[in-house]
From Swiss-Prot:
It holds the Pfam family WD40. It comes from the Eukaryota. PANTHER family: WD REPEAT-CONTAINING PROTEIN 76. DNA-binding protein that binds to both single- and double-stranded DNA. Binds preferentially to UV-damaged DNA. May be involved in DNA-metabolic processes. It comes from Meyerozyma guilliermondii (strain ATCC 6260 / CBS 566 / DSM 6381 / JCM 1539 / NBRC 10279 / NRRL Y-324). WD repeats lie at residues 218-259, 268-308, 319-357, 361-401, 418-456, 495-538, 542-573. Belongs to the WD repeat DDB2/WDR76 family. GO terms for biological process: DNA damage response; regulation of DNA damage checkpoint. This is DNA damage-binding protein CMR1. Keywords: Coiled coil, DNA damage, DNA-binding, Repeat, WD repeat.
């Protein structure tokens, strides 16, 4: 068979490549490489060494028979005494932890309520016994209390006593007449020129520089309420937290130790302190209310803490407190209170407290309420039920509670504002403007000073009602038509670890410009006028490390203070 031309060419290429390889001597090189590679030598076998056995002691049973152990069935006197002391110590510890969350009974000196850095009473034994009711204290225990009162000097209270003495001196210098200019109405018209001047004035306000804000820890836990005392020369800031502690900071106090702020922490309550206020005609008194159901007065002159009122559920057989959510004072003697259950109560502080009939304002928690400073019979309430309501206390009847699931009496309802989510707070100023905010991320300003739609709020009769729908359901029968003058977008989503944001008016602005403050979640304060125009955004990013959620303006001066979740305070001056 003859080969094709292509096959012939392929055979020639093969022969030519072989000849080329032979000339290069690659075959011999390959053989030499294979000869130079040594064969691996077998590894020497090593003798295995056995691990030394560790001698283990037999495990003894956790419980052994006394008979096998050779001991007697009865303990010695020393063992009995030691066991009894341990049991008493454990019982005392449990009792103290339980009593920490209960309210105080009776009157105390402020020095007795001082706590240490761990939040424990420095006069712990005295408070533990005093929290028991008088009829449960034995004669021997009363003698022990008297001895402990005599031995108070042995406890180191020098620093706390120094702060309280400064507060006492401060209280002695207060008179109601000193605040006449503050109390009388200061109404003045202003235009954009005044607005610009105010913004420039607030631009000069700076964070307090005498101490680092991280050192101004005024309470043990998250701050839930704060108050700025009306004094201007010797300023005082008071704050309460979630566990009943109340801290007092003498801002301008000076002493031998200038390395730390002058702060004293007390514990007058067993649960969260909901509100702190100073009555206008009694500047030496500080009122506090708590979820433990009590309202107490701190007297800066006498340095005493006394119980003003205590609310309990009338439908419960045992002593079941009604948590007080907010308080306000009308006409210097009338104390108004709201509860976590939606109740309202009035009490004349000139007479001994005896709980009377509770009024029904909401079926859910009232988070905040405010009195019209121009008409004490009118109040506004903000509730968890997503409404803000206006009431007339002159007209109280069971018929007025037609909207409620309960049969309690209610005041006359003027009108209602409905929100998408719960309303956190409401506040009333001297120009008949309301401000409220809630979890719908808005701040609403209402003008009730008289317009074409609504007459002046102080002229409303005791049966006045705004327009309402034809009543087919309970909700339709409630008067509505309360529209906001201004609606401001504001982030109010505080979450679990930050206190609820609440907008508050300045009580008696010395400059005549009505303004309110609300904390900003970006660690700042926002201040607006009553037309909803922002005046300033107070912040210090380098030194403010937390949200000053609970905020307040000084009653007259343009100073702002706020408390954080860690118990620290930020002051702009």
């Amino acid at each position: 068979m003859t080969l094709s031309d292509f096959e012939k060419q392929r055979q020639e290429n093969i022969q030519r490549n072989k000849e080329l390889l032979r000339q290069l001597e690659l075959d011999s090189l390959n053989d030499s490489i294979s000869r130079e590679v040594p064969k691996p030598k077998p590894k020497a076998k090593r003798r295995k060494t056995e691990n030394a056995r560790v001698k283990t002691e037999p495990i003894m049973p956790s419980r052994r028979s006394r008979r096998l152990a050779g001991s007697t069935m009865e303990d010695s006197e020393e063992d009995k005494q030691m066991r009894e002391e341990m049991e008493k110590a454990e019982e005392r510890k449990r009792e103290l932890e339980k009593l920490k969350s209960t309210r105080l009974f009776g009157d105390f000196k402020l020095i007795d309520l001082v706590v240490n850095k761990q939040g424990e009473f420095k006069n712990q034994d005295k408070i533990l016994k005093a929290k028991e009711k008088d009829n449960e204290i034995k004669k021997e225990e009363k003698e022990e209390i008297k001895k402990e009162e005599d031995s108070t000097d042995s406890i180191d209270l020098s620093r706390d006593n120094e702060v309280l003495q400064k507060l006492q001196q401060l209280g002695d210098r207060f008179s109601a007449g000193d605040f006449y200019e503050m109390i009388k109405d200061t109404k003045s018209k202003y235009d954009d020129t005044v607005l610009q001047e105010k913004r420039e004035e607030f631009d000069r306000v700076k964070l307090y520089e005498r101490f680092d804000p991280l050192d101004i820890k005024i309470t043990q836990q998250r701050i839930t309420s704060i108050a700025f005392h009306p004094a201007k020369d010797d300023r005082v800031v008071v704050a309460g937290d979630t566990t009943g502690y109340v801290g007092i900071w003498a801002v301008d106090a000076k002493g031998d130790d200038e390395t730390s702020p002058h702060i004293t922490i007390l514990k007058p309550h067993g649960k969260a302190v909901a509100r702190i206020l100073t009555p206008e005609q009694q500047p030496s008194s500080i009122l506090t209310c708590s979820y433990d159901g009590s309202v107490r007065r701190l007297d800066l002159k006498r340095l005493e803490s006394t119980e003003v009122a205590y609310l309990q559920d009338p439908y419960e057989s045992s002593d079941y407190p009604l948590g007080v959510s907010d308080i306000n004072v009308a006409d210097n003697n009338l104390l108004y209170m709201t509860t976590l259950s939606g109740n309202f109560y009035r009490y004349d502080m000139r007479s001994p407290f005896k709980q009377g009939e509770l009024l029904r304002l909401h079926d859910k928690k009232i988070g905040s309420f405010s009195i019209n400073p121009n008409a004490f019979h009118q109040i506004a309430t903000a509730s968890l039920d997503r409404t803000m309501k206006l009431w007339d206390l002159r007209n109280i009847s069971q018929k007025n509670s037609y909207w409620s699931e309960f049969d309690d009496k209610s005041p006359h309802l003027y009108c209602t504002y409905h929100s998408r989510l719960s309303v956190s707070c409401v506040d009333w100023n001297h120009d008949n403007h309301l401000v409220c905010n809630g979890y719908d991320d808005t701040v609403n300003v209402f003008d009730l000073s008289g317009s074409d739609k609504l007459p002046l709020v102080t002229e409303w009769s005791k049966d006045y009602e705004t327009e309402k729908k034809k009543r087919t359901t309970i909700e339709d029968g409630v008067p509505e038509k309360l529209e906001a003058l201004t609606r401001i977008k504001h982030n109010c989503q505080t979450g679990r670890w930050v206190s609820i944001l609440k907008s508050k008016w300045q009580l008696h602005p010395a400059d005549g410009l009505q303004k309110f403050v609300i904390a900003n979640m970006n660690r700042a304060f926002d201040i607006y006028d009553q037309k909803g125009r922002i005046l300033c955004h107070l912040t210090d990013p380098d030194r403010m490390t937390a949200v000053p959620a609970v905020s307040m303006l000084h009653p007259t001066e343009n100073w702002c203070v706020g408390g954080s979740a860690s118990g620290k305070v930020y002051l702009f001056e």
